[in-house]
Amino acid sequence: MVTPMSVLAPFLAGLCLVALPVSTHSVQPEPDRGVWRTAAPAPTKRTEVAAATLNGKIYVVGGFEQPGLGNLLNLAITASVQEYDPSTDRWTTKASMPVGLHHVGIGVTGGRLYVIGGYTQSGLTVWHPVATVYAYDPATDSWAERATMPTARGALSVTVHEGKLYAIGGYDRNANSAAVEVYDPERNAWTSRAPLPTPRDHLASATAAGKVYAIGGRVNGDYRRNLSVMELYDPVTNRWARAADLPTARSGITAAEVGGRIYVFGGEGGGGTFRENEAYDPVRDTWQTMAPMPTGRHGLGSAVVQGRIHVLSGGPTPGGSFSDLNEVFTPPGERMTKEG
């Protein structure tokens, strides 16, 4: 978790199957746990970002930048938006958000990118929760404000199901929110749905097999109180149910869906940051440990292009740390599909 002091501290301180010649035992191949590679780093080091894919390009928005003289007045909160093109391995700076935000929710539908909630600066605090919704149009490289979310909160998670954006959980700096509020871009209107059974913040969410999943997180902003709980929501019945727990209790995580499976990356806890990469199969309700991240991080974002998951930015150590990392995970089967 980033605190004002941790942000300002720099200022204040001045498969291989081996064939044996003869054997009476069969040799089992190593399970395919996916592979990692490194892509072009982002132009700036950041943490507590959000990321999403739109029209084959990846957008990284908001968060905290490394403190410097240029961002002292806004306590290092950034409104910047950076676009990454995997086909060229290059970054481009796009139109900034109307206001600097961190710990936002993000989703893409109808050809636009939506940034929902989060925290912003108010006086000397960087933890003022907001209910704002901003829509980005890549055709005009511009932002527009949309109908505000009913519940102001940050450290929430957003996922998309059938063209609607589900804003789940979060923290208003007093208590965890159980709010599940659904935004319909066509109507520019919000609807409240059944509350999250386990209120939490710094969670991840994803949509798979027609269900919405709320994964991990923490209690009242305290990463020493990480959760492994995962709950699934059925939009048809408007009911929540318990699913198999995340193997590693963690928060400050990110999740992405590829090939019907949900991959959960990173996070932080009292002992440091996590390299864990765990995959959930909604058909079997089971988890599998995948190849760990090259660099453990929290406050990171993820986005998928052509079956590959880009895991972006975030802090390598708990609290106020920053990175420009762009590490790319290819899940099992995707390498064969895309490259072979």
Task: List each model region and its residues.
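Bacterial N-terminal signal peptides
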Residues: 9-19
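Kelch-like beta-propeller repeat domains
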Residues: 22-340
